[in-house]
Amino acid sequence: MAKQPKRIQAWTGDREAAHAVAEAIALVKANAKAKFDESIEISVNLGVDPRHADQQVRGVVNLPSGTGRDVRVAVFAKDAKAAEATAAGAEHVGAEDLYEKIVGGFMDFDRVIATPDMMALVGRLGKVLGPRGLMPNPKVGTVTPNVGQAVKDAKGGAVEFRVEKAGIVHAGIGKVSFTDEALLINVKAMVDALVKAKPAGAKGIYVKRIGLSSTMGPGFKIDIASVNA
């Protein structure tokens, strides 16, 4: 058997047991040894089959403690709405000019927001934005006339989530540098949002497993009951 890297050998904590959420957070932070501020990600296994239309799980949650990320926002809007987006802090605002930049390969953004009247134009970017999960969608508030608020939400802690083929939702919920309490609040907010997004077609146990990990560290299981304690 190949020898494990020293980084893995140094990991501590029981990775098989389900821990109270506060304990899991402490273990994840204790095992984050990278020289950069690692992101912390939650993974939630849901009792759904995304192949069925009535078992899709998708939405957006505003994390109370923020994400710790510098989210770059591109907005498709014109005139007064373009000015509103710029005033709210959007890095890239435009219409046909922004479209042409993206067609030419420009992708220096993490979120795309559009006013409803811009969607005929933005829709033509489906093959570029869609596979990257960047296509604006009214269900998650990224197609809206209220572009200023949408930009503020994106920069202030709004996280989009969508169930993957295996029935798992992955999402960043902060950084190792966050306090334990800040991470705990974000974990609870994320799980609460997933419960509220439970689709009509879901049968049996809905939240089946919750895990927490850092960018370079091990994952730890969370006792589901402790999230709502």
From Swiss-Prot:
InterPro entries: Ribosom_uL1_bac-type (IPR005878), Ribosomal_uL1 (IPR002143), Ribosomal_uL1-like (IPR023674), Ribosomal_uL1/biogenesis (IPR028364), Ribosomal_uL1_3-a/b-sand (IPR016095), Ribosomal_uL1_CS (IPR023673). Pfam families: Ribosomal_L1 (PF00687). It comes from the Bacteria. Gene3D superfamilies: 3.30.190.20, 3.40.50.790. Part of the 50S ribosomal subunit. The gene is rplA. CDD domains: Ribosomal_L1. The lineage of its organism: Bacteria, Pseudomonadati, Pseudomonadota, Alphaproteobacteria, Caulobacterales. This is Large ribosomal subunit protein uL1. One of its GO terms (biological process) is regulation of translation. Binds directly to 23S rRNA. The L1 stalk is quite mobile in the ribosome, and is involved in E site tRNA release. PANTHER family: 54S RIBOSOMAL PROTEIN L1, MITOCHONDRIAL, LARGE RIBOSOMAL SUBUNIT PROTEIN UL1M. One of its GO terms (cellular component) is cytosolic large ribosomal subunit. Keywords: Repressor, Ribonucleoprotein, Ribosomal protein, RNA-binding, rRNA-binding, Translation regulation, tRNA-binding. Belongs to the universal ribosomal protein uL1 family. GO terms for molecular function: rRNA binding; structural constituent of ribosome; tRNA binding.
